[in-house]
């Protein structure tokens, strides 16, 4: 009996580890697909894709999974036709939320997203209802280190618009057209770690909410991010 209990515990731990790995792989797939859609499927000429692939490999993601994500994003997967579509709405507390998707069935996708908003006490809006609160920016997130000054100087010289110095990371913001130049320049600095790099929507003004509402919004974002068709969820919660 003790042996059975021990095996049950091992299976439970393995299941948790598998779920964790699956979540990590899903995150990598989304990053790879976003980069490939934005800059093409060749890592040699697409710095964001090259970094996304390197991060996936570092987490032991199989190369066939990586290539499938690239092929899916660039329309090179037989029998699969994907469309980019964005949905927008209000979460708890009136927080504006944008949901970027890649789907082969818009009816299924919008039904799943509408259900998630409704269950959270929010509402899916019409096109343009919250999009005006966001703008496209290139974002490069770098781990802080003794190279911070060099990173910031290089980023500014190569076209960065703004740099936020947070506790553990530097967040570099660029115009979309300057993103690749800035990313390439920063990535050439030895001994730094780029955690995230893509062109994404950024809130132009933030919405303040209390802790209880913030928890509800975070739960909605988590539910949305678990949907297969969802690529990115962007909000304006402070």
Swiss-Prot record:
One of its GO terms (molecular function) is DNA binding. Its main location: cytoplasm. It is found in: Cytoplasm. GO terms for biological process: regulation of DNA-templated transcription. InterPro entries: Integrase-like_N, TACO1_YebC-like_2nd/3rd_dom, TACO1_YebC_N, Transcrip_reg_TACO1-like, Transcrip_reg_TACO1-like_dom3, YebC-like. The keyword Transcription applies. The keyword Transcription regulation applies. This is Probable transcriptional regulatory protein NAMH_0626. NCBIfam families: PRK00110.1, PRK12378.1, YebC/PmpR family DNA-binding transcriptional regulator. It comes from the Bacteria. Belongs to the TACO1 family. One of its GO terms (cellular component) is cytosol.
């Amino acid at each position: 009996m003790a042996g059975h209990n021990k095996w049950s515990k091992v299976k439970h731990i393995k299941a948790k580890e598998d779920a964790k790995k699956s979540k990590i792989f899903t995150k990598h797939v989304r990053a790879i697909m976003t980069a490939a859609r934005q800059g093409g499927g060749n890592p040699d000429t697409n710095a964001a894709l090259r970094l996304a692939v390197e991060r996936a490999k570092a987490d032991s993601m199989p190369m066939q999974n990586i290539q499938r994500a690239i092929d899916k994003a660039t329309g090179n997967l037989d029998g699969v036709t994907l469309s980019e579509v964005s949905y927008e709405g209000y979460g708890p507390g009136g927080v504006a939320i944008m949901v970027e998707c890649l789907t082969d069935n818009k009816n299924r996708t919008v039904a799943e997203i509408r259900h998630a908003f409704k269950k959270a006490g929010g509402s899916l809006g019409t096109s343009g209802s919250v999009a005006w609160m966001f703008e496209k920016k290139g974002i490069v997130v770098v781990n802080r280190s003794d190279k911070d000054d060099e990173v910031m100087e290089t980023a500014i010289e190569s076209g960065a618009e703004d740099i936020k110095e947070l506790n553990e990371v530097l967040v570099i913001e660029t115009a979309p057209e300057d993103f690749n130049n800035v990313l390439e320049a920063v990535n050439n600095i030895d001994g730094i770690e780029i955690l995230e790099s893509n062109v994404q929507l950024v809130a132009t003004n933030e919405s303040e909410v209390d802790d209880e509402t913030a928890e509800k919004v975070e739960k909605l974002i988590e539910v949305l991010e678990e949907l297969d068709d969802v690529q990115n969820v962007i909000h304006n919660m402070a």
